[in-house]
Amino acid sequence: MLLKTKHFGEINIDESKIIEFKDGIPGFENLKRYVVLYDGDKNSPFRWLQNVDDGELAFAVVNPFMVVKDYDFEIPDEAVESLGIESILDVMVLSIVVVPEDISKMTMNLKAPVIINTKNNKGMQVVLDTDRYSVRHYIIEELRRQEVNVGAGSDEKEK
Amino acid sequence: MLVLTRKKNESIIINDNIEITVVDVQGEQVRIGINAPKSISIYRKEIYLEIQAENKKAAEIKNVDLKEDLKDFLK
């Protein structure tokens, strides 16, 4: 189907890739269908969580494990149950990113990750019951530290 | 809002599958136990509101090219 996207204009998406968020996500409870878009570089930790029913709604998201190497949590029972998760191999985890005017202050939400069961394309945002992770975790320092390949077009380093 | 008075160890039942029990009362603090189906999401309200606000902020994202914009920071 043709999908209007916030950042990529009108694109053709495979309907079987649509992820159902039964309860939406907090703040956008009525919008329930999303797709994950890559901008062509699978090595980059960034993706877009694009809403299907409202083209103007798209979140920048990251694969948190590519940014925070020791990020670790147990998937809450409520997610295992409502997403019907059978194997950890089917699970995709994304952190929603806030990109302010000053991009150096970009943060990711480690406290409330988006969990997707890629087997049945069901997703939800969960809230971790821990004080270990913050809703506003600064990204730039992490990226610098980890030397993550963000696809920033930097010269390839010699191994 | 419906207001009920409960003592320690007393419960209320909602919709025949959610049980809320007053576990302990110490001055200003009340400990509450909740028995509910696993698929029900339960949040501390202030945290839920914080997540909502954060998501709304995230949705205000302008048309950025993260790759380009991050270049300068990761040299």
From Swiss-Prot, chain A:
Primary location class: cytoplasm
Organism whose genome encodes this protein: Acetivibrio thermocellus (strain ATCC 27405 / DSM 1237 / JCM 9322 / NBRC 103400 / NCIMB 10682 / NRRL B-4536 / VPI 7372)
Location within or outside the cell: Cytoplasm
Known partners and oligomeric status: Interacts with translational regulator CsrA and flagellin(s).
Residues in the signal sequence: none
Identification of the protein by name: Flagellar assembly factor FliW
Name of one Pfam family that matches: FliW
Record-level GO BP terms: bacterial-type flagellum assembly; regulation of translation
PANTHER family per UniProt: FLAGELLAR ASSEMBLY FACTOR FLIW
Gene Ontology cellular component list: cytoplasm
NCBIfam families given in the database record: PRK13285.1-1, PRK13285.2-1
Cited InterPro entries: Flagellar_assembly_factor_FliW, Flagellar_assmbl_FliW_dom_sf
Biological role stated in the UniProt entry: Acts as an anti-CsrA protein, binds CsrA and prevents it from repressing translation of its target genes, one of which is flagellin. Binds to flagellin and participates in the assembly of the flagellum.
UniProt keyword annotations, A-Z: Bacterial flagellum biogenesis, Chaperone, Cytoplasm, Translation regulation
Family, as annotated: Belongs to the FliW family.
Gene: fliW
